Amino acid sequence: MGGTRAVALLALGSFAMGTDAYAMAGLLPAIGADLHVSVSLAGQSVTAFTLCYALAAPLFSAVLARWGTRTVLVTALVVFVLANAGTALTGSYAGLLGTRALAGAAAGLFTPAAATAAVALVPPERRGRALGLVLGGMSAGTVLGVPLGLLVAAAHGWRAALWLITALGVAALLGVAGALPPVRGAAAPSLRARFGALARPRVAVVVAVTFTQTVAGLGLYTYLEPVLHRVAGIGSVVPYLWVWGIGGVCGSLLAGTLVDRTGKPALLAVALLGTLGGALALLPWAGAVPGLVLLPLVVWGAVGWAFVVPQQHRLLGPDAQGGAAAVGLNSSATYLGGAVGSALGGLALAHGLDAGRLPLLAAGVACAGVLLHLTAVPALARREARTGRPTTEHAHGAGAADATAAGAPERNAP
């Protein structure tokens, strides 16, 4: 099987994960009503998903990687299917939290393994596009899977939407188990090596900026329905989630091409983060004009999803051991940020904050990420200039992808 077809199978798995992760925002009111809890409390099921996603990659990947990348992917999909079936069957709030946590752990294992497999299956000059396709599969879940799931939920209840997601997981499982070729992945880094990557200043900056971006973007997305209802008087959020998802697909796919052509993932990342802050700040004001709210939504989706590609690209370099550890941490930061954002958003709403103010708070967090990037990266450059040599993290893993994009040779992961 060619590399492109194999990457497409990984994108199918990402599609199932994306549908699961992002459909929940539209299902929270129905879930809360069925289980007799508030929307903000039901939203903590998203926190459970994202928190376990964040913890799964560093805690379990080092052990499971001994089985091989393909086996890790299949295992993650099996757990994902069982967890979503459990969510569909649960009759208690505790059961909801437990099954969502299990689904999040499965997604946390699948996503970094899929990213690592994607770059191992294609030539170096196509790695940006391969990453974009895998991540685009997840954002495609928001365009096709989320609206379809919400329509099914409107007609047959929220549990039917979870059964649909379970079926998507089964399809992805059959495809990956039956057709994905063996993948030559990196040697599994130890837990100490994974967290030790944070001692590298450049890796730490990339991971910290990713964290701020997802606190803002994913945290706000969890409560998109009450936000849109407050700022624009919108009832059904299905078409608006669809617009957000279309932006996400376009952003994911275009970002990979931009990274490959420009060779400047760091510059692209900070530009995207600044644009995200502007789009979120515009959201409350755009809601006052009919139809205008679509503009910040599509921009938010596009730049939010596009941001992941240059960040991952900066961490996947010729030092496969360091790159795998850094990518796992970055994936963890992505969903840890979502968990923190969801938890803080739910807490704010539970304490009476006007839902229309949430986008402004999220915009402030995004701007803090821009400030962090603009101050930390030049400081590291000055440090390198003083010492007369690049920092270790620039030579190994974090900056290696930048060198590759600029034309330096890069080898496949051993």
Regions found by a protein language model. Give the residues of each.
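C-terminal transmembrane helical hairpin of 12-TM major facilitator-type secondary transporters
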Residues: 266-310
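C-terminal membrane-cytosol helix-exit motif in multi-pass small-molecule transporters
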Residues: 166-186, 372-376
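Helix-to-loop junctions at the C-terminal end of transmembrane segments
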Residues: 56-69, 251-264, 349-350
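Helix-breaking motifs and short loop linkers at transmembrane-helix boundaries and internal kinks
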Residues: 34-36, 68, 89-95, 263, ...
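Conserved MFS/SLC helix-loop-helix module at the cytosolic interface between two early adjacent transmembrane helices
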Residues: 55-91
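A late C-terminal transmembrane helix in Major Facilitator Superfamily
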Residues: 318-354, 362
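Paired small-residue
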Residues: 83-86, 94-103, 291-299
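Cytoplasmic helix-loop-helix junction between adjacent transmembrane helices
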Residues: 93, 99-138
